[in-house]
Amino acid sequence: MAVLVLLFCLVTFPSCVLSQVQLKQSGPGLVQPSQSLSITCTVSGFSLTSYGVHWVRQPPGKGLEWLGVIWSGGSTDYNAAFISRLSISKDNSKSQVFFKMNSLQADDTAIYYCAK
C-alpha cells in the first residue's frame, strides 16, 4: 500500500519528489566530423557556486565515459584523452555551464550529458 501511495504522489504531485534539481541541455543535435560540438547546460535547484558539474557521454552500445568537470570555484579537470580539444566553462549568474569539444571524429558519436 505504501508503494501505491508513493507512486500516486510522484505521478500526481511531482513536488513530492525530494529534490527539484534540474539540468537542461541545449545544443545542435548533430555535428559533422571536424566541426565543434557546443552544448549549454542550464541548471536549477542548486547553485553553481556550491556544486560542480560533470560531463559524460555514452557511445552507442557502450557504457558511460567521463569527459570532465567544472568545480564550484571554476577550476576544471579533464579526461586526459580529451584535454587538448575539450573546454568547459560556466556563467554562475545565468546558472549555465558550457561544453565545447573541437575537431570531432566519427568515434565521438555519443549522447552527451551534464550531471551534478
From Swiss-Prot:
One Gene Ontology term, aspect cellular component: immunoglobulin complex
Domain of life: Eukaryota
Disulfide bond entries: C41-C114
Alphabetized InterPro entries for the sequence: Ig-like_dom, Ig-like_dom_sf, Ig-like_fold, Ig_V-set, IgHV
Keywords: Adaptive immunity, Disulfide bond, Immunity, Immunoglobulin, Immunoglobulin domain, Signal
Occurrences of domain Ig-like (ranges): 20-116
Gene3D superfamilies, A to Z: Immunoglobulins (2.60.40.10)
GO biological process: adaptive immune response
Signal sequence residues: 1-19
Stated name of the protein: Immunoglobulin heavy variable 2-4
